[in-house]
Protein backbone atom coordinates (compact mmCIF):
# COMPACT_ATOMS: atom_id res chain seq x y z
CA UNK A 1 0.00 0.00 0.00
CA UNK A 2 1.35 3.43 -0.99
CA UNK A 3 -0.28 6.77 -0.20
CA UNK A 4 0.11 9.95 -2.26
CA UNK A 5 -1.05 13.54 -1.81
CA UNK A 6 -2.77 14.48 -5.07
CA UNK A 7 -4.46 17.26 -7.01
CA UNK A 8 -5.10 20.75 -5.74
CA UNK A 9 -2.94 20.54 -2.63
CA UNK A 10 0.14 19.68 -4.71
CA UNK A 11 -0.74 22.28 -7.35
CA UNK A 12 -1.25 25.14 -4.89
CA UNK A 13 1.88 24.26 -2.90
CA UNK A 14 3.94 24.47 -6.10
CA UNK A 15 2.32 27.85 -6.85
CA UNK A 16 3.16 29.09 -3.36
CA UNK A 17 -0.52 29.43 -2.48
CA UNK A 18 -2.17 28.37 0.80
CA UNK A 19 -3.25 24.72 0.81
CA UNK A 20 -6.80 24.36 2.11
CA UNK A 21 -8.00 20.81 1.48
CA UNK A 22 -5.86 17.72 1.11
CA UNK A 23 -6.88 14.73 -0.98
CA UNK A 24 -5.02 11.44 -0.95
CA UNK A 25 -4.85 8.46 -3.28
CA UNK A 26 -4.08 4.97 -2.00
CA UNK A 27 -2.43 2.55 -4.43
CA UNK A 28 -2.33 -1.21 -3.88
CA UNK A 29 -5.00 -1.50 -1.18
CA UNK A 30 -8.42 -3.11 -0.87
CA UNK A 31 -11.46 -1.64 0.89
CA UNK A 32 -11.12 -4.24 3.63
CA UNK A 33 -7.51 -3.27 4.28
CA UNK A 34 -8.61 0.35 4.67
CA UNK A 35 -11.38 -0.61 7.09
CA UNK A 36 -8.96 -2.79 9.06
CA UNK A 37 -6.65 0.24 9.37
CA UNK A 38 -9.46 2.24 11.00
CA UNK A 39 -10.61 4.28 8.01
CA UNK A 40 -14.33 5.03 7.62
CA UNK A 41 -15.85 4.38 4.19
CA UNK A 42 -18.00 7.25 2.86
CA UNK A 43 -17.95 6.79 -0.91
CA UNK A 44 -21.11 5.27 -2.34
CA UNK A 45 -20.10 4.96 -6.00
CA UNK A 46 -16.39 4.34 -5.46
CA UNK A 47 -14.17 3.61 -2.44
CA UNK A 48 -13.46 6.82 -0.52
CA UNK A 49 -12.46 6.74 3.13
CA UNK A 50 -11.98 9.23 5.95
CA UNK A 51 -8.75 9.12 7.95
CA UNK A 52 -9.48 8.15 11.57
CA UNK A 53 -7.63 11.20 12.99
CA UNK A 54 -7.54 13.95 10.35
CA UNK A 55 -10.83 13.05 8.61
CA UNK A 56 -9.18 13.90 5.29
CA UNK A 57 -10.36 11.94 2.24
CA UNK A 58 -8.40 8.93 1.06
CA UNK A 59 -9.57 7.37 -2.21
CA UNK A 60 -8.46 4.06 -3.66
CA UNK A 61 -6.76 4.52 -7.02
CA UNK A 62 -9.36 4.12 -9.74
CA UNK A 63 -10.09 4.48 -13.41
CA UNK A 64 -13.28 5.70 -15.05
CA UNK A 65 -15.01 4.57 -18.22
CA UNK A 66 -17.76 6.48 -20.00
CA UNK A 67 -20.97 4.45 -19.81
CA UNK A 68 -23.73 7.03 -20.29
CA UNK A 69 -24.50 10.67 -21.00
CA UNK A 70 -23.57 13.69 -18.93
CA UNK A 71 -21.20 14.04 -16.01
CA UNK A 72 -22.70 11.11 -14.05
CA UNK A 73 -22.46 8.53 -16.83
CA UNK A 74 -19.25 6.84 -15.69
CA UNK A 75 -18.34 3.38 -14.46
CA UNK A 76 -15.51 3.34 -11.92
CA UNK A 77 -12.97 0.57 -11.45
CA UNK A 78 -11.00 0.54 -8.20
CA UNK A 79 -8.62 -2.31 -7.42
CA UNK A 80 -5.10 -2.84 -6.05
CA UNK A 81 -3.72 -3.17 -9.60
CA UNK A 82 -4.73 0.38 -10.63
CA UNK A 83 -1.55 2.45 -10.87
CA UNK A 84 -1.05 6.03 -9.72
CA UNK A 85 -0.47 7.08 -13.34
CA UNK A 86 -3.79 5.53 -14.39
CA UNK A 87 -5.58 7.34 -11.58
CA UNK A 88 -4.00 10.68 -12.48
CA UNK A 89 -4.92 10.25 -16.14
CA UNK A 90 -8.64 10.60 -15.35
CA UNK A 91 -8.08 14.11 -13.92
CA UNK A 92 -9.29 17.13 -15.86
CA UNK A 93 -6.19 19.33 -16.17
CA UNK A 94 -2.49 18.55 -16.16
CA UNK A 95 -1.94 20.93 -13.25
CA UNK A 96 -4.37 18.80 -11.23
CA UNK A 97 -2.75 15.50 -12.29
CA UNK A 98 0.15 15.88 -9.86
CA UNK A 99 1.04 13.72 -6.86
CA UNK A 100 3.57 13.86 -4.02
CA UNK A 101 4.91 10.85 -2.14
CA UNK A 102 6.02 10.50 1.48
CA UNK A 103 9.52 11.70 0.60
CA UNK A 104 8.24 14.89 -0.98
CA UNK A 105 8.98 13.73 -4.52
CA UNK A 106 6.59 15.03 -7.19
CA UNK A 107 5.10 12.48 -9.56
CA UNK A 108 4.18 14.25 -12.79
CA UNK A 109 3.41 11.86 -15.66
CA UNK A 110 1.40 14.43 -17.67
CA UNK A 111 3.75 17.45 -17.44
CA UNK A 112 1.65 19.45 -15.00
CA UNK A 113 4.69 21.28 -13.60
CA UNK A 114 5.63 22.45 -17.07
CA UNK A 115 2.12 23.82 -17.56
CA UNK A 116 2.20 25.45 -14.12
CA UNK A 117 5.37 27.29 -15.10
CA UNK A 118 3.86 28.22 -18.48
CA UNK A 119 0.62 29.29 -16.75
CA UNK A 120 -1.43 26.98 -18.97
CA UNK A 121 -4.71 25.21 -18.27
CA UNK A 122 -4.44 22.11 -20.46
CA UNK A 123 -6.56 18.93 -20.45
CA UNK A 124 -4.86 15.65 -19.58
CA UNK A 125 -6.42 13.43 -22.24
CA UNK A 126 -9.28 13.29 -24.77
CA UNK A 127 -11.39 11.78 -21.96
CA UNK A 128 -11.86 15.40 -20.84
CA UNK A 129 -14.57 15.63 -23.49
CA UNK A 130 -16.66 12.96 -21.77
CA UNK A 131 -17.57 15.16 -18.79
CA UNK A 132 -19.42 18.42 -19.61
CA UNK A 133 -18.96 19.74 -16.08
CA UNK A 134 -15.29 20.19 -16.93
CA UNK A 135 -16.15 23.08 -19.24
CA UNK A 136 -17.37 25.01 -16.20
CA UNK A 137 -14.49 23.80 -14.03
CA UNK A 138 -11.91 25.09 -16.51
CA UNK A 139 -13.73 28.43 -16.70
CA UNK A 140 -13.67 28.57 -12.90
CA UNK A 141 -9.95 27.73 -12.76
CA UNK A 142 -9.32 30.47 -15.34
CA UNK A 143 -11.08 32.93 -13.02
CA UNK A 144 -9.36 31.60 -9.91
CA UNK A 145 -5.85 31.93 -11.36
CA UNK A 146 -6.33 34.92 -13.66
CA UNK A 147 -4.28 37.09 -11.30
CA UNK A 148 -1.36 34.71 -11.94
CA UNK A 149 -1.77 35.14 -15.73
CA UNK A 150 -3.05 31.64 -16.41
CA UNK A 151 -4.72 31.06 -19.76
CA UNK A 152 -6.48 28.13 -21.40
CA UNK A 153 -4.46 26.09 -23.91
CA UNK A 154 -5.74 26.52 -27.46
CA UNK A 155 -6.46 22.81 -27.88
CA UNK A 156 -8.39 22.72 -24.60
CA UNK A 157 -10.54 25.69 -25.56
CA UNK A 158 -11.17 24.04 -28.94
CA UNK A 159 -12.32 20.87 -27.17
CA UNK A 160 -14.60 22.91 -24.91
CA UNK A 161 -16.17 24.47 -28.02
CA UNK A 162 -16.71 21.01 -29.52
CA UNK A 163 -18.37 19.78 -26.33
CA UNK A 164 -20.68 22.79 -26.26
CA UNK A 165 -21.58 22.46 -29.94
CA UNK A 166 -22.35 18.77 -29.43
CA UNK A 167 -24.97 19.64 -26.81
CA UNK A 168 -23.05 18.02 -23.94
CA UNK A 169 -23.79 20.91 -21.55
CA UNK A 170 -27.51 20.24 -21.80
CA UNK A 171 -26.96 17.19 -19.58
CA UNK A 172 -25.83 19.34 -16.64
CA UNK A 173 -28.28 19.73 -13.76
CA UNK A 174 -29.15 23.25 -12.55
CA UNK A 175 -27.61 22.47 -9.16
CA UNK A 176 -24.21 21.64 -10.66
CA UNK A 177 -24.23 24.68 -12.93
CA UNK A 178 -25.06 26.94 -10.00
CA UNK A 179 -22.46 25.33 -7.71
CA UNK A 180 -19.66 25.96 -10.19
CA UNK A 181 -20.98 29.47 -10.85
CA UNK A 182 -21.23 30.24 -7.15
CA UNK A 183 -17.63 29.15 -6.65
CA UNK A 184 -16.51 31.20 -9.64
CA UNK A 185 -18.30 34.30 -8.35
CA UNK A 186 -16.23 34.17 -5.16
CA UNK A 187 -12.89 34.23 -7.02
CA UNK A 188 -10.76 37.33 -7.44
CA UNK A 189 -11.77 37.73 -11.10
CA UNK A 190 -15.27 36.28 -11.54
CA UNK A 191 -15.74 38.08 -14.86
CA UNK A 192 -13.18 35.73 -16.41
CA UNK A 193 -15.49 32.76 -15.78
CA UNK A 194 -18.26 34.30 -17.87
CA UNK A 195 -15.83 35.46 -20.56
CA UNK A 196 -14.49 31.91 -20.93
CA UNK A 197 -18.03 30.54 -21.14
CA UNK A 198 -18.73 33.06 -23.88
CA UNK A 199 -15.51 32.17 -25.70
CA UNK A 200 -16.52 28.51 -25.93
CA UNK A 201 -20.21 29.12 -26.66
CA UNK A 202 -21.42 27.91 -23.26
CA UNK A 203 -22.75 31.29 -22.12
CA UNK A 204 -25.50 31.15 -24.74
CA UNK A 205 -26.52 27.70 -23.50
CA UNK A 206 -26.35 28.23 -19.74
CA UNK A 207 -26.85 32.00 -19.34
CA UNK A 208 -28.79 33.19 -22.41
CA UNK A 209 -29.97 36.30 -20.53
CA UNK A 210 -26.35 37.43 -20.11
CA UNK A 211 -25.22 36.30 -23.55
CA UNK A 212 -28.01 38.40 -25.11
CA UNK A 213 -26.36 41.58 -23.77
CA UNK A 214 -23.31 41.28 -26.03
CA UNK A 215 -23.75 43.39 -29.12
CA UNK A 216 -26.40 45.58 -27.48
CA UNK A 217 -25.16 49.20 -27.58
CA UNK A 218 -25.58 51.86 -24.91
CA UNK A 219 -25.05 55.62 -25.41
CA UNK A 220 -21.34 56.32 -25.84
CA UNK A 221 -21.67 59.47 -23.70
CA UNK A 222 -22.45 57.35 -20.64
CA UNK A 223 -20.86 54.08 -21.76
CA UNK A 224 -17.61 54.59 -23.69
CA UNK A 225 -17.30 50.78 -23.81
CA UNK A 226 -20.69 50.86 -25.67
CA UNK A 227 -21.34 47.08 -25.58
CA UNK A 228 -23.68 46.16 -22.71
CA UNK A 229 -22.16 42.69 -22.37
CA UNK A 230 -18.70 44.20 -21.98
CA UNK A 231 -20.10 46.66 -19.43
CA UNK A 232 -21.69 43.80 -17.49
CA UNK A 233 -18.36 42.00 -17.12
CA UNK A 234 -16.64 45.28 -16.22
CA UNK A 235 -19.17 45.92 -13.46
CA UNK A 236 -18.73 42.39 -12.14
CA UNK A 237 -14.97 42.93 -12.05
CA UNK A 238 -15.51 46.19 -10.15
CA UNK A 239 -17.96 44.53 -7.74
CA UNK A 240 -15.31 41.91 -6.95
CA UNK A 241 -12.91 44.71 -6.02
CA UNK A 242 -15.52 46.44 -3.85
CA UNK A 243 -16.96 43.45 -1.99
CA UNK A 244 -16.29 39.77 -1.27
CA UNK A 245 -20.05 39.14 -0.89
CA UNK A 246 -21.60 36.62 -3.26
CA UNK A 247 -24.92 38.52 -3.05
CA UNK A 248 -23.37 41.77 -4.27
CA UNK A 249 -21.47 40.12 -7.10
CA UNK A 250 -24.44 38.13 -8.39
CA UNK A 251 -26.76 41.14 -8.22
CA UNK A 252 -24.21 43.21 -10.14
CA UNK A 253 -24.00 40.52 -12.81
CA UNK A 254 -27.78 40.72 -13.31
CA UNK A 255 -28.29 44.47 -13.00
CA UNK A 256 -28.70 45.26 -16.73
CA UNK A 257 -30.47 42.13 -18.01
CA UNK A 258 -33.42 44.28 -19.08
CA UNK A 259 -31.33 45.92 -21.81
CA UNK A 260 -31.45 42.63 -23.68
CA UNK A 261 -35.20 43.21 -24.17
CA UNK A 262 -34.93 46.68 -25.72
CA UNK A 263 -36.20 46.68 -29.34
CA UNK A 264 -33.39 47.45 -31.80
CA UNK A 265 -35.20 50.50 -33.15
CA UNK A 266 -34.87 52.12 -29.70
CA UNK A 267 -31.12 51.47 -29.35
CA UNK A 268 -28.89 52.80 -27.86
CA UNK A 269 -31.32 54.06 -25.21
CA UNK A 270 -32.92 51.66 -22.76
CA UNK A 271 -35.67 53.48 -20.91
CA UNK A 272 -37.32 51.27 -18.32
CA UNK A 273 -34.69 48.55 -18.57
CA UNK A 274 -34.50 48.23 -14.79
CA UNK A 275 -38.06 47.07 -14.09
CA UNK A 276 -38.01 45.12 -17.39
CA UNK A 277 -35.01 43.15 -16.17
CA UNK A 278 -36.74 41.92 -13.01
CA UNK A 279 -38.58 39.14 -14.83
CA UNK A 280 -35.35 38.01 -16.51
CA UNK A 281 -33.61 37.83 -13.13
CA UNK A 282 -36.52 35.74 -11.88
CA UNK A 283 -36.30 33.51 -14.96
CA UNK A 284 -32.56 32.93 -14.60
CA UNK A 285 -32.81 32.25 -10.87
CA UNK A 286 -35.68 29.80 -11.24
CA UNK A 287 -33.86 27.86 -13.95
CA UNK A 288 -30.61 27.55 -11.98
CA UNK A 289 -32.33 27.30 -8.58
CA UNK A 290 -30.41 30.26 -7.20
CA UNK A 291 -30.98 30.78 -3.45
CA UNK A 292 -33.89 33.10 -2.66
CA UNK A 293 -31.85 35.74 -0.83
CA UNK A 294 -29.55 36.18 -3.84
CA UNK A 295 -32.52 36.26 -6.20
CA UNK A 296 -34.37 38.87 -4.15
CA UNK A 297 -31.40 41.24 -3.95
CA UNK A 298 -30.68 40.85 -7.68
CA UNK A 299 -34.28 41.75 -8.53
CA UNK A 300 -34.13 44.86 -6.34
CA UNK A 301 -30.82 45.95 -7.87
CA UNK A 302 -32.18 45.47 -11.38
CA UNK A 303 -35.22 47.59 -10.56
CA UNK A 304 -33.64 50.42 -8.55
CA UNK A 305 -29.97 50.86 -9.54
CA UNK A 306 -30.74 53.72 -11.93
CA UNK A 307 -32.81 55.45 -9.26
CA UNK A 308 -29.79 55.48 -6.91
CA UNK A 309 -27.74 57.24 -9.60
CA UNK A 310 -30.22 60.16 -9.50
CA UNK A 311 -30.04 60.51 -5.71
CA UNK A 312 -29.42 64.31 -5.63
CA UNK A 313 -32.77 65.01 -7.33
CA UNK A 314 -34.82 62.47 -5.37
CA UNK A 315 -37.51 63.82 -3.09
CA UNK A 316 -37.26 62.82 0.60
CA UNK A 317 -40.56 60.98 0.22
CA UNK A 318 -39.11 58.94 -2.66
CA UNK A 319 -36.04 58.06 -0.60
CA UNK A 320 -38.14 56.75 2.29
CA UNK A 321 -40.35 54.85 -0.17
CA UNK A 322 -37.18 53.28 -1.56
CA UNK A 323 -36.25 52.03 1.91
CA UNK A 324 -39.75 50.57 2.16
CA UNK A 325 -39.46 48.92 -1.25
CA UNK A 326 -36.18 47.17 -0.44
CA UNK A 327 -37.48 46.14 3.02
CA UNK A 328 -34.55 47.93 4.64
CA UNK A 329 -36.26 48.13 8.03
CA UNK A 330 -36.10 44.34 8.35
CA UNK A 331 -33.05 43.76 6.14
CA UNK A 332 -30.77 46.76 6.70
CA UNK A 333 -27.83 45.05 4.98
CA UNK A 334 -29.57 45.67 1.67
CA UNK A 335 -28.76 49.38 1.83
CA UNK A 336 -25.03 48.67 1.80
CA UNK A 337 -25.41 45.95 -0.82
CA UNK A 338 -27.38 48.19 -3.17
CA UNK A 339 -24.95 51.06 -2.62
CA UNK A 340 -22.07 48.78 -3.64
CA UNK A 341 -23.79 47.38 -6.73
CA UNK A 342 -24.74 50.87 -7.89
CA UNK A 343 -21.16 52.03 -7.41
CA UNK A 344 -19.90 49.02 -9.39
CA UNK A 345 -22.31 49.97 -12.19
CA UNK A 346 -20.94 53.52 -12.43
CA UNK A 347 -17.28 52.56 -12.11
CA UNK A 348 -17.58 49.54 -14.40
CA UNK A 349 -17.21 51.75 -17.48
CA UNK A 350 -14.22 52.59 -19.63
CA UNK A 351 -12.49 55.63 -18.15
CA UNK A 352 -14.67 55.73 -15.01
CA UNK A 353 -12.90 53.02 -13.01
CA UNK A 354 -11.49 55.48 -10.46
CA UNK A 355 -14.58 57.69 -10.26
CA UNK A 356 -16.04 58.82 -6.96
CA UNK A 357 -19.60 57.72 -6.27
CA UNK A 358 -21.12 60.15 -3.75
CA UNK A 359 -24.60 58.69 -4.31
CA UNK A 360 -23.53 55.64 -2.35
CA UNK A 361 -22.46 57.77 0.61
CA UNK A 362 -25.69 59.76 0.48
CA UNK A 363 -27.78 56.60 0.39
CA UNK A 364 -26.00 55.27 3.48
CA UNK A 365 -26.32 58.60 5.30
CA UNK A 366 -30.01 58.97 4.46
CA UNK A 367 -30.59 55.46 5.77
CA UNK A 368 -28.88 56.27 9.06
CA UNK A 369 -31.07 59.36 9.42
CA UNK A 370 -34.30 57.54 8.57
CA UNK A 371 -33.72 54.57 10.83
CA UNK A 372 -32.74 56.83 13.73
CA UNK A 373 -36.32 58.13 13.99
CA UNK A 374 -37.59 56.44 17.18
CA UNK A 375 -40.74 54.32 16.93
CA UNK A 376 -41.14 54.54 20.70
CA UNK A 377 -41.87 58.28 20.58
CA UNK A 378 -44.63 57.73 18.02
CA UNK A 379 -46.29 55.11 20.20
CA UNK A 380 -45.94 57.26 23.32
CA UNK A 381 -47.57 60.16 21.44
CA UNK A 382 -50.75 58.10 21.38
CA UNK A 383 -50.86 56.87 17.80
CA UNK A 384 -52.58 53.50 17.31
CA UNK A 385 -52.56 50.72 14.71
CA UNK A 386 -51.94 51.87 11.16
CA UNK A 387 -51.53 55.44 12.41
CA UNK A 388 -48.19 54.44 13.93
CA UNK A 389 -46.74 53.51 10.54
CA UNK A 390 -48.19 56.62 8.86
CA UNK A 391 -46.77 58.96 11.50
CA UNK A 392 -43.44 57.14 11.52
CA UNK A 393 -43.21 57.57 7.75
CA UNK A 394 -43.99 61.31 8.06
CA UNK A 395 -41.26 61.76 10.66
CA UNK A 396 -38.76 59.80 8.60
CA UNK A 397 -39.52 61.94 5.54
CA UNK A 398 -39.09 65.10 7.61
CA UNK A 399 -35.78 63.86 9.03
CA UNK A 400 -34.46 62.93 5.58
CA UNK A 401 -35.63 66.30 4.18
CA UNK A 402 -33.74 68.15 6.92
CA UNK A 403 -30.61 66.07 6.30
CA UNK A 404 -30.84 66.39 2.52
CA UNK A 405 -31.09 70.18 2.61
CA UNK A 406 -27.77 70.31 4.46
CA UNK A 407 -25.84 67.37 2.99
CA UNK A 408 -27.30 66.62 -0.45
CA UNK A 409 -29.10 69.59 -1.96
CA UNK A 410 -30.51 69.17 -5.48
CA UNK A 411 -28.24 70.50 -8.26
CA UNK A 412 -28.88 74.05 -9.39
CA UNK A 413 -31.19 74.10 -12.39
Swiss-Prot record:
Assigned keywords, A-Z: ATP-binding, Hydrolase, Magnesium, Metal-binding, Multifunctional enzyme, Nickel, Nucleotide-binding, Nucleotidyltransferase, RNA repair, RNA-binding, Transferase, tRNA processing
Gene3D superfamilies, sorted: Beta Polymerase, domain 2, cca-adding enzyme, domain 2
PROSITE patterns linked to this entry: HD (PS51831)
Any matching Pfam family: PolyA_pol_RNAbd
Xref: InterPro entries: CCA_bact, HD/PDEase_dom, HD_domain, NT_sf, PolA_pol_head_dom, PolyA_RNA-bd, tRNA_CCA-adding_enzyme
Cofactor: Mg(2+); Ni(2+)
Biological process, per Gene Ontology: RNA repair; tRNA 3'-terminal CCA addition
Binding site for CTP: 8, 11, 91, 137, 140
Catalytic activity annotation: a tRNA precursor + 2 CTP + ATP = a tRNA with a 3' CCA end + 3 diphosphate; a tRNA with a 3' CCA end + 2 CTP + ATP = a tRNA with a 3' CCACCA end + 3 diphosphate
Family from the record: Belongs to the tRNA nucleotidyltransferase/poly(A) polymerase family. Bacterial CCA-adding enzyme type 1 subfamily.
This protein's domain notes: Comprises two domains: an N-terminal domain containing the nucleotidyltransferase activity and a C-terminal HD domain associated with both phosphodiesterase and phosphatase activities.
Functional note: Catalyzes the addition and repair of the essential 3'-terminal CCA sequence in tRNAs without using a nucleic acid template. Adds these three nucleotides in the order of C, C, and A to the tRNA nucleotide-73, using CTP and ATP as substrates and producing inorganic pyrophosphate. tRNA 3'-terminal CCA addition is required both for tRNA processing and repair. Also involved in tRNA surveillance by mediating tandem CCA addition to generate a CCACCA at the 3' terminus of unstable tRNAs. While stable tRNAs receive only 3'-terminal CCA, unstable tRNAs are marked with CCACCA and rapidly degraded.
Protein name, as recorded: Multifunctional CCA protein
Taxonomic classification: Bacteria, Pseudomonadati, Pseudomonadota, Gammaproteobacteria, Enterobacterales
Amino acid sequence: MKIYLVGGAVRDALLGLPVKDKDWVVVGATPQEMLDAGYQQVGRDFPVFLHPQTHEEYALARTERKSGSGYTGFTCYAAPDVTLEADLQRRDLTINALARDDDGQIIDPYHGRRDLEARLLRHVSPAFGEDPLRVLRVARFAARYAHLSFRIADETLALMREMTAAGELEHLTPERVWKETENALTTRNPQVYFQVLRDCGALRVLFPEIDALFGVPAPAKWHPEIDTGVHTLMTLSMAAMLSPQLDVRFATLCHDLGKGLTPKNLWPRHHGHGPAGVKLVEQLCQRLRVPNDLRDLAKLVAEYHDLIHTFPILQPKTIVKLFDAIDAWRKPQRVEQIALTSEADVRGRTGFEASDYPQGRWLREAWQVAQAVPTKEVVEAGFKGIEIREELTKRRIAAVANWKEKRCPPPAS
